[in-house]
């Protein structure tokens, strides 16, 4: 579906529909200066009813479909998005992972006070999970991919601390 990955276009679509979300994962790390590569955009979204309706409108515009084998034509529904689970989607502008919760069942409301507002480009401000919380979550997950990136995230946090 996606011919070119454009995470900024996905974020602009969400902002244009007033979707409440927090950027987590690799894009959150990159926005905070970590020199890492990422292949998808991870968002923890608010599961409040009004927000889910706005999110569904954004996903419709993005032509979002599940990217799991055999489900490539399935679209996310309200009942999918209200769950605490992960929705692994492909959009017109690349892979998007929508997370009801992360870590130890932490959702949008629980994480909001652990975010920073950052400029994502083109006058778009986004809520991003702060680097220390991102590190804590990666330590909890403890899979090979997360363990590999931890030294880079810690070093970035250390460098940011020196610059403050």
Report residues per predicted region.
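Compositionally biased terminal segments of proteins
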Residues: 1-164
């Amino acid at each position: 579906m996606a011919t070119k990955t454009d995470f900024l276009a996905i974020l602009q679509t969400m902002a244009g529909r007033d979707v409440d979300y927090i950027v987590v994962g690799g894009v959150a790390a990159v926005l905070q200066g970590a020199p890492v590569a990422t292949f998808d955009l991870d968002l923890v979204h608010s599961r409040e009813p009004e927000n889910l309706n706005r999110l569904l409108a954004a996903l419709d515009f993005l032509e979002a479909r599940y990217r799991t084998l055999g489900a490539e034509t399935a679209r996310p529904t309200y009942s999918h998005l209200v769950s605490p689970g992960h929705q692994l989607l492909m959009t017109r502008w690349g892979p998007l992972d929508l997370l009801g919760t992360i870590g130890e069942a932490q959702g949008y409301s629980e994480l909001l006070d652990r975010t920073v507002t950052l400029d994502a480009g083109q006058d778009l401000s986004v809520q991003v999970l702060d680097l220390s919380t991102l590190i804590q979550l990666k330590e909890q997950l403890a899979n090979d991919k997360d363990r590999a990136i931890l030294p880079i995230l810690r070093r970035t946090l250390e460098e940011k601390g020196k610059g403050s």
